[in-house]
A protein has these predicted regions:
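Alpha/beta-hydrolase active-site loop
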Residues: 176-194
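Fungal secretory targeting signals
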Residues: 1-10, 440
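C-terminal subdomain of alpha/beta-hydrolase-fold enzymes, centered on the catalytic histidine
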Residues: 274-440
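Glycine-rich "HGGG/HGxG" loop immediately N-terminal to the catalytic nucleophile
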Residues: 84, 153, 161, 165-179, ...
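Short beta-strand element of the alpha/beta-hydrolase
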Residues: 124-132
Length: 440
């Protein structure tokens, strides 16, 4: 029998996370507070950003244009106010920390930061929201009120739990190898059990969706159903053979062509370098806040067509993964590669699965028939190209994704959500129904 210790290792407490936090073995409230010294250092580094000389006419082909980087550096060092953002994060979200187990294959404690917003509705469904790269808990901010307090009682409501993946945001990066996506999923199931949610549903895209698919196999009773906004399915040998013979359907042709498009090589380049040499690439990105901002922005821009990212907005997204350093989040790709996830090796999801696709994301044209090979697909929706959302629909187009959630889980036979009406789930003892933990 494996014995777990939930004591935080000395290596974590000795290493500066650059923010104030206490990770115990039970959920505790957190007030986000980044160290003054780190903020001063970051502004100084932004001011000292060295701008790369670029080749004319290759803007957004070779990378982010130099003038963008120069403008960001100036704005970050002279205008951007993290303390204002911090106040907004503390007033908008109910933050918690805890420590959980991650199963037999990773016996070290897993400290987590998470958001927990309970609905006032007695019939609300517990929902585990998992972000992707390069996101954080922040992705849930624009949709959480729609989920906890839908506009009318005919729509399903949710108790929303949105953790930072380990190494992202305020969830400390693992200090040992072996915390892959499957182990992350086991830690998130432990979190839901700790919150007294014995059954729950899941929503996620990108890495978050990958984790939910692994969780579905590991926890077939607890995870009742899932809604994915990036249900990745690779074409098999037969698909590629038919494509070469021009025998594929329009959807199949579009998705395979997308994967073969030279522009898509940008996305694959991120996977390859982050999965192969995460520490090497992180050395420079950890030292340069603006360099890190440019690194993540190139992918964000390509995967969210039609959305205009503001400078303050981009800096905040960058800061949330720069505070503790980007290495832990980047290294998750190395673990995903080890598990075969980057090659599309997933277990079949027997639970009901909803699939929604937003234009610009990597799996936009994936045919229904392909998704049915890897899951019990009971809901499938592809948005028209003019509908914004891309890789980040919860953040960019929260109403549209909320409507997907309502449509999927509002249908009991399609999603299995009827079980939540038949079971009386008790509110967690440490977080009474309707209470505001910040007042305790």
């Amino acid at each position: 029998m494996v014995h777990f210790s939930l004591a935080i290792p000395a290596t974590l407490t000795e290493h500066s996370l650059n923010f104030v936090a206490n990770f115990s073995n039970q959920p505790r409230p957190l007030i986000v507070k980044v160290h003054d010294s780190f903020l001063l250092e970051t502004k100084a580094k932004a001011a000292l950003t060295r701008i790369t000389t670029q080749v004319e006419g290759m803007e957004f082909v070779d990378g982010v244009p130099a003038n963008n980087v120069s403008d960001w550096a100036r704005h970050w060092s002279t205008v951007y106010d993290w303390r204002k953002v911090e106040d907004e994060l503390n007033s908008k979200f109910r933050h918690f920390t805890t420590t959980v187990q991650a199963g037999d294959n990773y016996t070290y404690p897993v400290p987590l930061h998470f958001i927990h917003h309970r609905s006032p509705r007695h019939d609300a469904i517990p929902l585990l929201f998992l972000h992707g790269w390069p996101g954080t808990f922040h992705e849930v901010g624009n949709i959480v009120d729609l989920l906890t307090n839908p506009p009318n009682t005919s729509l399903p409501a949710f108790h929303v739990v949105a953790p930072d993946l380990p190494g992202f945001g305020f969830s400390p990066a693992p200090t040992h190898a072996g915390l892959g996506l499957r182990e992350m999923g086991q830690s998130f199931n432990s979190l839901m059990m700790q919150l007294n949610y014995s059954r729950y549903v899941g929503q996620g895209g990108d890495i978050g969706s990958h984790i939910l698919r692994l969780m579905a196999a590991d926890f077939p009773v607890s995870l009742v159903s899932m809604l994915s906004n990036l249900f990745s399915v690779s074409p098999n040998a037969t698909d590629l053979e038919r494509y070469a013979k021009h025998e594929t359907s329009p959807d199949e042709t579009a998705q395979i062509s997308l994967l073969k498009n030279p522009d898509f090589s940008w996305t694959k380049a991120y996977w390859d370098i982050e999965a192969s040499a995460p520490l090497q690439v992180s050395i420079g990105l950890t030292d340069s806040p603006v360099g890190w901002m440019a690194w993540q922005y190139m992918g964000m821009r390509m995967l969210s067509p039609g959305y205009d990212w503001g400078v303050d907005e981009l800096i905040t997204w960058s800061m949330l993964n720069y505070i503790q350093g980007p290495y832990g989040g980047i290294r998750s790709y190395k673990e995903a590669k080890r598990e075969g996830v980057l090659d599309g090796n997933f277990p079949y999801v027997a639970q009901p699965v909803g699939v929604v696709q937003y234009f610009g994301d990597a799996a936009y044209y994936t045919p229904l028939e392909w998704t049915q090979r890897q899951g019990n697909i009971s809901f499938y929706s592809r948005k028209a190209p003019h509908v914004v959302g891309g890789h980040f629909p919860a953040y960019i187009n929260p109403r549209a994704l909320a409507e997907d959630c309502w449509a999927f889980w509002g249908n009991e036979s399609r999603s299995g959500s009827g079980i939540f009406l038949r079971e009386a789930l008790l509110a967690p003892a440490w977080f009474p129904q309707g209470s505001n933990v910040r007042d305790q």
